[in-house]
């Protein structure tokens, strides 16, 4: 099979007319085209490599053939198989098959098909988050980070940006639901397993971290940020959704449920980006009670890995700066806060120091 696929690939390489004719026929005739999606599912890296090279050679630099692929039943089957392979190989990104699969998905995204692929795979997955959708988001996130610094990626049109904005809200709501179920712990084991499937929870968490990071990146591309995307986030009430997510994370016992730590870091970063030079968002986060939640992130938590805990604190300080800048109402909230106690940390004890609160200020003295 590998030799036969390679032979077809050799015949079509450099033959644009032949590639176009054959590709259209494969996409039109499900019986013929399905052969190649089935080859992608074979447990043989050589066969998979030859098949991916064939697919990439057919669609490379062809907007028309990419369009045909994402809309054809045969093409969708190929995409499912390719994304499955990417998921299987994601821990070995130097693998040649991973590179080929990435190149195919990347080519389709370049022609503006991210949303089409996402919706198609979602529809074939009972609208559940899964590894294929997560890998699709990972490819998009990787492409955005690899793009020229300070410039908006030209493969992100209105449809793609709107989809990303909607995913932030959708995945926040799903994650909050999951965390509430964990916190309450009131359902029977059978009910929990039916509602909170482990794989589903894992994929929601991974996808949400990615989509929060992607959104923050788009908002901080340059001094002005992505103004169109920001308005979409505002329209989707993402500030409220992310604040609710952060609030829910605060209620979790981080020592027992450490898996949600990264959500706090990326939530704070996005909230800070939304409030940057925007009086509407500054006022909104005050009105929904978000300022104390942001302030609470300035401490370093023992449950967090050290570097991520520090990053969380830095993002929280930056977010507070954006929230308080030229906003007297927000500044007044901070001014009204009074210190209650000085926390004695293990590090201070080891250094022989004791923290005391004197006239509202923290003082250190020898223990």
State where each predicted segment sits.
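Short inter-helical turns and helix N-cap capping residues of alpha-solenoid HEAT/ARM repeat scaffolds
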Residues: 43-44, 90, 94, 204, ...
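Elongated alpha-helical scaffolds that mediate protein-protein interactions in large eukaryotic proteins
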Residues: 1-37, 41-50, 57-77, 89-99, ...
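Sequence-level detector for tyrosine residue identity
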Residues: 36, 102, 111, 118, ...
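Amphipathic alpha-helical segments within extended alpha-helical solenoids and repeat-rich scaffolds
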Residues: 28-43, 73-89, 114-136, 153-195, ...
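Extended HEAT/HEAT-like alpha-solenoid repeat tracts in very large eukaryotic scaffold/adaptor proteins
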Residues: 1-8, 47, 51-55, 97-105, ...
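Long, compositionally biased, phosphorylation-prone intrinsically disordered terminal regions
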Residues: 40, 110, 145, 150, ...
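Eukaryote-biased recognition of C-terminal alpha-helical segments
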Residues: 43, 54, 315-322, 338-367
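Eukaryotic scaffolding regions of large macromolecular assemblies
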Residues: 208, 215-336, 345
């Amino acid at each position: 099979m590998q030799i036969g696929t390679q032979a077809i690939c050799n015949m079509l390489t450099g033959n644009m007319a032949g590639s176009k004719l054959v590709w259209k026929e494969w996409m039109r005739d499900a019986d013929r085209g399905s052969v190649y999606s089935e080859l992608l599912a074979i447990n043989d890296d050589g066969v998979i490599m030859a098949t991916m090279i064939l697919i990439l050679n057919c669609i490379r630099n062809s907007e028309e053939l990419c369009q045909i692929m994402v809309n054809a039943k045969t093409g969708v089957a190929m995409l499912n198989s390719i994304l499955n392979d990417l998921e299987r190989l994601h821990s070995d990104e130097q693998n040649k098959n991973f590179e080929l699969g990435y190149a195919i998905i990347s080519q389709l995204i370049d022609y503006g098909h991210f949303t089409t692929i996402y919706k198609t795979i979602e529809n074939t997955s009972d609208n559940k988050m899964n590894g294929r959708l997560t890998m699709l988001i990972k490819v998009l996130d990787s492409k955005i980070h690899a793009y020229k610094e300070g410039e908006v990626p030209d493969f992100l049109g209105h449809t793609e940006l709107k989809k990303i904005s909607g995913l932030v809200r959708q995945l926040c709501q799903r994650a909050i639901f999951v965390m509430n179920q964990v916190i309450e712990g009131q359902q029977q084991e059978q009910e929990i397993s039916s509602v909170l499937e482990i794989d589903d929870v894992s994929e929601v968490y991974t996808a949400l971290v990615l989509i929060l990071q992607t959104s923050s990146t788009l908002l901080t591309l340059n001094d002005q940020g992505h103004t169109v995307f920001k308005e979409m986030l505002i329209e989707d009430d993402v500030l409220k959704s992310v604040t609710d997510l952060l609030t829910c994370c605060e209620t979790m016992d981080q020592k027992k449920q450490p898996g949600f730590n990264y959500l706090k870091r990326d939530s704070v970063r996005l909230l800070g980006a939304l409030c940057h030079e925007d009086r509407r968002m500054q006022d909104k986060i005050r009105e929904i009670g978000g300022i104390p939640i942001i302030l609470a992130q300035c401490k370093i938590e023992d449950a967090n890995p050290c570097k991520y805990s520090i990053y969380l604190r830095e993002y929280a300080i930056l977010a507070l700066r954006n929230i308080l800048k030229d906003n007297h109402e927000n500044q007044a909230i901070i001014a009204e806060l009074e210190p209650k106690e000085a926390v004695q940390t293990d590090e201070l004890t080891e250094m022989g120091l004791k923290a005391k609160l004197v006239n509202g200020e923290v003082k250190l003295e020898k223990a």
